[in-house]
């Protein structure tokens, strides 16, 4: 897995790349506050079959920051601009958490960009669309994640900053991905960790059934970041 930089408008966007340059492109998209670092184990599993690209969206990880925190729609636009700058007109995309909302927003508006989608732990479950509802679930899931992931998240959150985190989270909580699902024609796999405290199985089933070509797979015993804790199992689903 190697670092890769691309200029997108006024910003430099950092990504990690792996796999043969002539293999089909697969983009891995991170969640709220974190960089693509926690996608690296999965990228390594996928690299023999795919050209894997793991961007840090603007303001996340090592990428330059936009002047202000981007909304879900703004992040989707940033993803589209990065895909264009990379010369990637059509890709398979796997996203986690907030990244699923970004992917859904872009795929609903520009469906021709996506061959296939994999949504891992898609947010936001309508029952928990407030900071008060989400905070306890964050801590419950945190105790189910490995310590190695906690270290990655701590570094990424410190870099992202509390004000940008709050603004981005506010946009995510106000987003309604369920209203966009019917406009996504790409085959889409919804993946949920069986011990994911962030999103319920009922919500993930609603996402899968709301998609014209959706399917739900539950990976038993795994938390929200199932792609990190069970990369080989998730890679086998892609």
Predicted regions and their residues:
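Flexible "cap/lid" loop of the alpha/beta hydrolase fold
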Residues: 101-109, 113-145
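Hydrophobic, aromatic-rich cap/lid helix
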Residues: 150-179
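Short alpha-helix in the alpha/beta-hydrolase fold that links the catalytic acid
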Residues: 177, 186, 200-209
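Short beta-strand/loop motif that positions the catalytic acidic residue
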Residues: 183-184, 190-192, 196
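Conserved acidic catalytic loop of the alpha/beta-hydrolase fold
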Residues: 73-91
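Conserved HGGG/HGGXW glycine-rich cap/lid loop of the alpha/beta-hydrolase fold
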Residues: 11-62
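Catalytic histidine neighborhood in serine/cysteine hydrolases
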Residues: 208-225
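Catalytic histidine-centered segment of alpha/beta-hydrolase-like enzymes
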Residues: 222-235
């Amino acid at each position: 897995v190697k670092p890769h930089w691309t200029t997108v408008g006024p910003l430099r966007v950092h990504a990690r790349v792996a796999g043969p340059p002539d293999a089909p492109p697969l983009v891995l998209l991170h969640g709220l506050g974190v960089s693509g670092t926690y996608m690296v184990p999965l990228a390594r599993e996928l690299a023999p079959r795919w050209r894997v690209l793991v961007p840090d969206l603007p303001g996340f990880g090592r990428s330059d920051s936009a002047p202000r925190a981007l909304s879900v729609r703004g992040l989707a636009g940033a993803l589209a601009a990065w895909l264009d700058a990379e010369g990637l007109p059509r890709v398979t995309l796997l996203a986690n958490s907030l990244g699923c909302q970004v992917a859904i927003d872009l795929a609903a508006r520009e469906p021709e960009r996506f061959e296939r989608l994999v949504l891992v732990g898609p947010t936001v479950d309508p029952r928990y669309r407030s900071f008060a509802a989400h905070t306890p679930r964050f801590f419950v899931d945190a105790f189910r994640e490995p310590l190695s992931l906690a270290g990655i998240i701590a570094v990424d959150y410190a870099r992202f900053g509390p004000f940008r985190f709050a603004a981005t989270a506010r946009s995510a909580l106000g987003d309604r991905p369920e209203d966009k699902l019917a406009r996504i024609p790409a085959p889409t796999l919804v993946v949920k960790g069986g011990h994911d405290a962030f999103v319920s199985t009922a919500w993930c089933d609603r996402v899968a059934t709301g998609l014209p070509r959706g399917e739900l797979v539950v990976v038993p015993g795994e938390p929200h970041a199932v792609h990190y804790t069970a990369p080989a199992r998730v890679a086998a689903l892609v």
